[in-house]
Amino acid sequence: MTTDIFFNPIWDVRLTDTSLRDGSHHKRHQFTKDEVQAIVAALDAAGVPVIEVTHGDGLGGSSFNYGFSKTPEQELIKLAAETAKDAKIAFLMLPGVGTKEDIKEAQNNGGSICRIATHCTEADVSIQHFGLARELGLETVGFLMMSHTIPPEKLAQQARIMADAGCQCVYVVDSAGALVLEGVRDRVAALVAELGDDAQVGFHGHENLGLGVANSVEAVRAGAKQIDGSCRRFGAGAGNAPVEALIGVFDKIGVKTGIDFFDIADAAEEVVAPAMPAECLLDRNALIMGYSGVYSSFLKHAIRQSERYGVPAHQLLHRAGQRKLIGGQEDQLIDIALEIKREQESGAAAAR
């Protein structure tokens, strides 16, 4: 079944708000129905064209390893689809976490854009999932996570695998917030050159080095047609590029999105912020993640193990970066915490 990309001719870029998916990491997956309904209504009214709703780790992510959802994600997807008047509802899935049945259920509940994420060197595991999504008539988006870890030409080869499998837009995903300006530009440009008219290119940034907005501008100038952000930076780590700031900057440089700056600023301040457990901070932990290249969703896991074992969270995160851990390896933070704990005890014993 052929599905066109949802893209208004008046837009230069299509923006996806990920507050209700990436923000789930920051909220420890505790969204209520009232919060989701209010946020979707506000974003929709501001003109946000795509709103992503899922557990932070995608369909099926509610688990002991990733954290349990307060409200089943499928119920939230259905509520979001019923609430939105114009916006399309997207959902994320990671092969090996979500299943084909999860995709079908999400579509039945009103989701129309399937975003499939893999580690940036493992695009081949998404082939069957893209095939199924296209057969179902879903629009498809591919996420190449931790894109900072391989060079542009290698990333472009992985993007080609996704596009050939049926992906309609492949994202450079800066999961760690580790890319700096030229790194984004070069990767996006490489994907644009490789994919041509076969698929669009997108960019998903994090604020761990404070560059979410600047990197998104670089991506657009390099040819990206889809950009992610979250109101109030509501996302993992220091959060995503704030949508309200993105729109302000895009307006200033003449990039059309169809989103009203004042309405989205109101939505961020009056609707999204009250649903956040705290602001997403650019603090030492977040900076260490960006500097060391650590997957942003590790933050809450590291804080939990820090409190459990009495070791500094920033040291946990730095060593996770040294070991080049990727999404799905959060449990290894326990091993690192025990390692640091042993070192502390050995040092204390030697000092006696």
Curated annotation (Swiss-Prot):
InterPro entries in the record: 2-IPM_HCS-like, 4OH_2_O-val_aldolase, Aldolase_TIM, DmpG_comm, DRE_TIM_HOA, PYR_CT
Residues annotated as site: Transition state stabilizer: 21
Domain of life, source organism: Bacteria
Amino-acid positions noted as binding Mn(2+) in the UniProt annotation, renumbered to this chain: 22, 204, 206
Catalytic activity of the protein: (S)-4-hydroxy-2-oxopentanoate = acetaldehyde + pyruvate
Gene Ontology molecular function, alphabetical: 2-isopropylmalate synthase activity; 4-hydroxy-2-oxovalerate aldolase activity; manganese ion binding
Binding site for substrate: 21-22, 175, 204, 295
GO biological process: catabolic process; L-leucine biosynthetic process
Gene3D superfamilies referenced in this protein's UniProt entry, alphabetically: 1.10.8.60, Aldolase class I
Catalytic residue list: 25 (proton acceptor)
Keywords: Aromatic hydrocarbons catabolism, Lyase, Manganese, Metal-binding
Enzyme Commission number, as recorded: 4.1.3.39
Ranges where the Pyruvate carboxyltransferase domain occurs: 13-265
Similarity field: Belongs to the 4-hydroxy-2-oxovalerate aldolase family.
Protein name as catalogued: 4-hydroxy-2-oxovalerate aldolase
